[in-house]
Regions:
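Interhelical loop/hinge segments that connect adjacent transmembrane helices in multipass membrane
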Residues: 1-7, 172, 188-230, 234, ...
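Signature of the first transmembrane helix
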Residues: 3-63, 95, 99, 106, ...
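Membrane-water interface segments that mark the loop-to-transmembrane alpha-helix transition
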Residues: 8-22, 47, 59-103, 116-119, ...
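Small-residue-rich midsections of specific transmembrane alpha-helices
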Residues: 18-28, 45-70, 125-133, 186-189, ...
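Alpha-helical transmembrane segments of multi-pass membrane proteins
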Residues: 53, 57, 92, 96, ...
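Specific pore-lining/lateral-gate transmembrane helices of multi-pass inner-membrane transport
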Residues: 69-86, 248-365
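Hydrophobic alpha-helical transmembrane segments
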Residues: 118-119, 150-196, 215, 365-371, ...
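Membrane-proximal transmembrane or re-entrant/amphipathic helices at the cytosolic face
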Residues: 415, 434-474
């Protein structure tokens, strides 16, 4: 299969996986909000935000570093096995840290449920670590359809078990156990698939581990900072305002997680192309790939952001019921930040490709300080609305900074021709939604048709020039 078809297939496979997993996530949210109630659902969201934090935090940049190494030199298979061994070796101490910190942060008498649920979820750290470490092998080979298959399988297992939890009337502990089992299924299938193309026996090599950490750490610190400020709002909200506030915010947050997962399939497809263009110092090709990816991301973000703002009450009511009506405002706020994250992620990968990790680190540190300071000041008074506002403000600050950095490092200034067409389509879509009866399915169909029709009339597909992206040099 040639490069164009491989990139297209990877993109399609991951997009399909995101649709399926997002659908399963919506189903589980629908079930759990009604079964557990606001506070119970708040405990579940707290756990699902808290545990993955440690997986990404202790990634130390290894995932992206290994992908970059394997993309440039496929013969360096030991890098994969070294990183796999290192990630597994880090899993035990990170699990202990996660447990100890949970006992400290949620030590109140009324927070026993949260503490116990986190303890049940601790195996997630190992399973998610293995899945992440093995997934890089497929990412570097542009075979992300395997990762997509495993992700769907794991989500399906978890969703099936959550249905049993609800039918059986079990507690939040059983719901957390279902998520752990789904993560195990995902990791196990990835290991089985990886064995067909590479040995998955971890290498015990402390000296090479140290060298890996030294090389990956600048990037790792940037990613650590990014995950802290992405998850800090929900964690701080759970500490400062309790499970009920997290339950309300959790509806918006879970939708945010589902939405921002979609651009990931494009990032992982174009990152090897960006890396190789940067390694050849082919800035024209790098800018071309970046522009085409930027256009696709903007086209996707505009209807998501404007559509969600327009029909947020219908979304919340359908997803969680009238007990969660207060989630409408934070949803409208965080969805703006989600749209900004589409583009921010791409620009961050461009900086990584051109070896500007240290600069990216300082940018993330500045944004994190901004985020934490505002959250600590505003959450005690404004609760989940403050958390949502700070998250979106942080993404806006990050966008401005990244645009400047990408311009300086790669000479890239985004052309806004496609973005302008998307804005016109979005405006027409919102106008159509304003006169459409309040039925979620009907609103989604009308909005999608209106947006798509405007894009076709403006011949937006001709402006995308996707063949240039798919035909980028490798």
């Amino acid at each position: 299969m040639n490069l164009a078809r491989r990139v297209a297939w990877n993109t399609l496979a991951q997009a399909a996986a995101r649709v399926v997993t997002a659908g399963l996530s919506i189903v589980t949210t629908f079930l759990l909000t009604r079964h557990l109630g606001v506070s119970g659902y708040g405990v579940y969201v707290t756990v699902m935000v808290y545990i993955p934090f440690f997986v990404v935090f202790f990634d130390a940049g290894l995932t992206t570093f290994v992908v970059r190494s394997l993309s440039v030199d496929e013969a360096r298979s030991n890098v994969f096995r070294d990183a796999l061994g290192l990630r597994i070796a880090l899993a035990l101490p990170m699990t202990l840290v996660a447990f100890a910190l949970a006992m400290l942060l949620y030590r109140g008498g009324g927070e026993a449920t949260t503490r116990n649920a986190i303890a049940i979820a601790l195996p997630l750290i190992l399973f998610m670590t293995v899945a992440s470490a093995v997934g890089v092998l497929f990412q570097a080979r542009l075979e992300m359809d395997r990762v997509a298959t495993a992700e769907i399988f794991g989500q399906a297992v978890a969703a099936s078990l959550i249905v049993l939890v609800v039918v059986s009337g079990l507690s939040v502990y059983a719901a957390v156990g279902a998520a752990v089992t789904g993560a195990f299924a995902n990791a196990a299938l990835l290991l089985l698939l990886a064995r067909r193309i590479e040995s998955v026996r971890p290498l015990l090599a402390p000296r090479r581990w140290a060298a890996l950490l030294r090389k990956a750490l600048p990037l790792g610190l940037s990613l650590m900072i990014a995950v802290v400020y992405f998850r800090a709002d929900a964690v701080l909200l759970s500490i400062l305002k309790g499970a009920h506030a997290v339950g309300i915010y959790g509806v918006a947050y879970r939708l945010l997680e589902a939405v921002v997962a979609f651009p990931g399939f494009l990032y992982v497809s174009v990152f090897p192309l960006l890396t190789q263009a940067a390694a050849r110092r082919d800035l024209d090709n790098l800018r071309n790939v970046t522009q085409r990816a930027f256009d696709v991301l903007v086209l996707a973000a505009v209807p998501v952001v404007l559509g969600t703002i327009a029909i947020a009450p219908e979304i919340v009511d359908a997803l969680a019921g009238d007990r969660f009506d207060a989630a409408v405002t934070p949803l409208r706020i965080v969805i703006v930040g989600a749209g900004l994250m589409f583009v921010n992620g791409l620009f961050a990968y461009v900086l990584i490709a051109v070896d500007w990790q240290v600069t990216l680190l300082w940018t993330g540190a500045m944004t994190l300080a901004f985020n934490l300071a505002l959250n600590l000041v505003l959450i005690p008074r404004y609760s989940y609305n403050a958390a949502a506002s700070v998250a979106t403000a942080s993404e806006a600050l990050m966008l401005v900074t990244l645009v400047v950095l990408v311009m300086r490092s790669a000479g890239f200034i985004p052309a806004l021709r496609v973005a302008a067409k998307a804005a016109v389509g979005g405006a027409v879509m919102v106008a159509c939604l304003a006169v459409t009866p309040s039925n979620l399915a009907l609103l989604v169909v009308v909005g999608g048709c209106a947006y798509g029709a405007v894009l076709l009339l403006l011949r937006t597909h001709a402006s995308l020039q996707l063949r240039q992206l798919l035909g980028a040099k490798r």
